[in-house]
Amino acid sequence: TAGYYTRLVRPKEVTTDQCLAFAKDFHTKALNKEATEELTAYLEPDEKSDNTTYQTVNIHSDITHIQWGDMKPSVIGDVEWDIKESNTVYTSILAKYKVSCTDEEGAESIYNVKEFFRVRFLVDTIYLLDYNRNMEQVFDGRESDFDENGIILGIIPKDISYEINKDQTSAAFVQAGELWLYESKKGNLTKVFSMPDQEGRDTRGENDQHAVRVIGIDNKNNITFAVYGYMARGSHEGEVGVGIYYYDAAENKIEEKAFITSTKSFAIAEDELGKMVYYNQSTSLLHVLADGTLYRIDLKKDEKKVLAENLTDERYAVSDDGHLMVYQTGGKTDKSATLHIMNLKSGEDYTIKAEDGENLRPLGFINGDFIYGKVNPADTGITVSGEEITPMYEVQIRNSKNKEAAQYNFTEQSIYTTDVLIDGNLLTFNRVIKDGETYNSTKQEYVTNNEERKESKIVFETYVSENTGKQMRFTFADGVKKKQKQNEKPIYQPGKKTLTIELKGKEKEEKYYVYGMGELAAVYNKAGYAVQKAEQVSGVVISSEQKYVWEKGNRDLVYSTEAGKFQCEEGESSLDACERYMEQYHAQRLDLTGCSLDQMLYVINRGCPMIAILESAHAVLLTGYTMTDITYVDPSTGESYTVGMSEMENMTEAGGNTFIGYIR
């Protein structure tokens, strides 16, 4: 069975040809350092861009970085052009290619490049709405990739997957989709895994729809790792899933331990399986979270045990590298008094119990610390949009030793926390303020968690090259041998008894997928969060049913839904009246709380009015807009009003930016 993953729309009029021609022209002129003034006119240079690196350049970069500085790139092979979005307003295009660059010492390096354009063509005029170019150096272990202090990885992202052994003598790292092992004691370098090298290089091997994650490395340099996404080669060729592998350094061979198949696309499988599968070689235990069920599988004894079931997104959390997990052990999301925390790397686990009559909610991990919330059922109330809510009265952070590291309680100000978003080292507390039995949105709270840097003999750090800017390297405190020996390619050995698990791919709850810069950027279970992320990446939000929820910039400047007037019936609240009126549209209801009024104009432009909550929990129905004004119906009076955008912004901000949208 062949699976295809795409979205098809048929807009009335598109200008794809003109936009693609512009992108190709811009791409060529940037490479050849031509038409500098012409390209500069399309840019918006400011402090939003880091002009000390070539790893990522964007529309805010200076023209020097757009035109590759002194790098003198030469394209290898063909440029792959991909139309990601095309509508009546803009076209999004992603180009993928390889370039060869020669550094100041004459050494040639190969880079994988992704170049993104969002372009508008209007009345014979081209507008560059967004531009982003990422590059990643392909490591090949040449002599020039080493100096007396360590390994020079070059221009790569800072968030590569890597692990250091306990003796701090060896490093296993992933670069450009390939897994490498360096042993400083012997000066040995091994390319452990590479999709192209499994059977030679061709178009299949160059497919970038897979990723590699290092799970662990021991002091004998044996490595446990995962390959997830689309399998272009091997016994699982053509499948999407995650393979768990063990590299035996002494034997120089790789053994497959398990393979979990998925019917989902690579991007979604990568997002889910990249965190929800963990294998510990020393115990032969594999933990898999599949379709809401957490399994512990003993590969040595061939035994499978269910640890927990019905785990919705709110009932568990996993660390970025997958080795830490927490889940509620009983009850529903807001009715569980116990959390079970597992360190799958060390095998340690412990539980946290709530005070009598209270419940606990898992929120996530940050730098190895666990975050959870305390819930008192007595705090249950309703939001201004009419939904029942039981917010957290306190948020606690506990370190890896299960000791309290911090706590956050705002109840003295009648403020409670609904959830916490984790982005790198930043925690964002989404909060509400209590007014009787009603909760209104209030200002977010931001907390930075700075990880203490542990002393290590191997450090992954930044350094600066005169011609190529910021680069990354592994620095070894004891230095490295001048002459490196590159080992033979490992032998692949299919598992004697490989475990295979199939994920059905049926979502039990609605999810919202954010696509930006031509790729999946994030997945959320709340539409409002997805819209805010899509704003940051100039992207789109797609629901689980493949419906467009929101698009950056794709709306008419003037629009009216032609919705009629209506009025509250006797004993009916303004919110109930609005929702009664919206029943005729037979549309899907979305909570878009936290979004801006400007973002919500797109939702109106989809053809349905939307509900906005003003101060004092008063609901109105937004029915249309112009470039300067917005029109709404107030069910309390039954009249239609038109006010300026800034006035309506003040009105909706007073209601906590609470919006209820509808799509169909």
Regions found by a protein language model. Name each.
Residues 85-99, 221-227, 370-375, 429, ...:
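A short hydrophobic beta-strand element
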Residues 3-70, 146-188, 196-197, 204-210, ...:
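Core segments of small alpha/beta cavity-forming domains
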Residues 61-107, 210-219:
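Surface-exposed, charged secondary-structure patches
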Residues 89-128, 132:
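Exposed beta-sheet edge and beta->alpha loop/turn motif
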Residues 184-187, 249-250, 298-302, 343-347, ...:
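Short loop/turn segments that connect beta-strands within beta-propeller blades
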Residues 561-664:
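Conserved active-site-adjacent core of cysteine acyl-enzyme catalytic domains
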Residues 313, 350-362, 403-423:
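Conserved blade-ending motifs and adjacent loop-strand segments that build the rim/top face
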Residues 130-131, 189-198, 254-262, 305-309, ...:
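Beta-propeller fold detector
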